[in-house]
Design a protein with these regions (language model features):
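Polybasic, glycine- and aromatic-enriched phosphate-binding surface used to engage nucleic acids
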Residues: 1-181, 191-200
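Acidic, Ser/Thr-rich low-complexity intrinsically disordered segments
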Residues: 184-185, 203
């Protein structure tokens, strides 16, 4: 039987920052004591774009009492928690690569879910593998069977089945090659389809 996300040692969690409860730590401008505050509006065409063109404040002030909301910059996949009814996809992931982000830390607003690995960092192969799964029609259909609403729930994501470790890494390596082939500008629509990558790697 395939592992679930959680059984394989991964976990989707919801962004820690609820804005109205953290007003004193929300900032409009970058300062020495601030880090990026990521919102769902930072998810754009499969990537995290920061700063985004938005009317929302995008910085978070780090103090002793707010450090619990801070995450060290690392590879992850972000996922919008709320989607519009008319949107075609409930699962809208964004690949986040630590080496491509100019900050050592970040935090996330609670309209985002993101992936962690318990006790260690997520590897490049793993993060590309998860991005491919989340972008696939297979996972989209499966998730809709779990949840018919427009909300994407982290607890339900953690029950999703994933391939064995070696297969997940194979998926990730294939996606990495495709990403590199397409260059810097890539979206779910112009890369080899995620479902085709899964067919190649799983059969």
């Amino acid at each position: 039987m395939p592992n679930t996300v959680e059984e394989a040692g991964f976990r989707f969690i919801t962004g820690q920052v609820v804005e109205f409860r953290n007003k004193e730590y929300i900032a409009w401008e970058k300062k020495e004591s601030t880090i990026p505050l990521l919102h769902s509006c930072n998810v754009l065409e499969g990537r995290i774009v920061f700063p985004a063109q938005t009317e929302k404040p995008q910085y978070f002030v780090v103090k002793d009492e707010s450090k619990k909301n801070v995450m060290e910059n690392q590879n992850t996949v972000f996922l919008k928690r709320a989607t519009a009814k008319e949107e075609k996809r409930r699962l809208q992931p964004a690949l986040h690569l630590a080496d491509a982000f100019a900050y050592k830390q970040f935090t996330a607003e609670n309209h985002l879910n993101y992936l962690i690995k318990v006790g260690e960092r997520i590897s490049l192969c793993e993060v590309y593998g998860f991005y491919t799964l989340l972008s696939s029609d297979i996972w989209e259909r499966y998730y809709r069977m779990l949840n018919g609403s427009t909300q994407v729930n982290s607890a339900e994501l953690n029950t999703m089945p994933i391939p064995a470790k070696d297969v997940l890494q194979k998926i990730g390596k294939t996606a990495m090659r495709e990403w590199k082939k397409q260059g810097d500008y890539i979206t779910r629509d112009n890369m080899l389809s995620s479902d085709e990558i899964l067919r190649q790697c799983i059969g």
